[in-house]
Amino acid sequence: MEIKITFTGGKKVNAEIDGMVIPTDQPRKYGGEGSAPTPYDHFLASIGTCAGIYVLSFCEERKISTDRISLVERFETEKRGDKVVLTKIILEVIVPPEFPEKYHNALIKVIDQCAVKKTIMNPPKFDIKTIVK
């Protein structure tokens, strides 16, 4: 897999993958236009959206409507020196009262299959190089 990163002006940096563009920008207070999520926002959103696709698939397989199902992702942080560090990611699956109770724990288990979560739990090695072409 290859993702091409391009610079499109100002503080905008895009990722191009499989013919699609994922735009990023920085907030105005950091010199950007605030026209797109930051790379870190995309990273955090990838956790919730990955969990979401597993919940969606689970419900589709059982013909359960997702019209009133949502996920909420929240975070706990801690100040360490001059930095704020992410210490906990909280995912809540909000289901309507008629959602079958027998599937409550199954939703948690299916979210544990999320590839993004698995990658965070077992981080890869990074190999960063400068190449002159």
Regions found by a protein language model. Give the residues of each.
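Extended beta-strand/beta-hairpin segments
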Residues: 1-45, 56-133
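Alpha-helical metal-binding/catalytic segments enriched in His/Glu/Asp
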Residues: 50-51
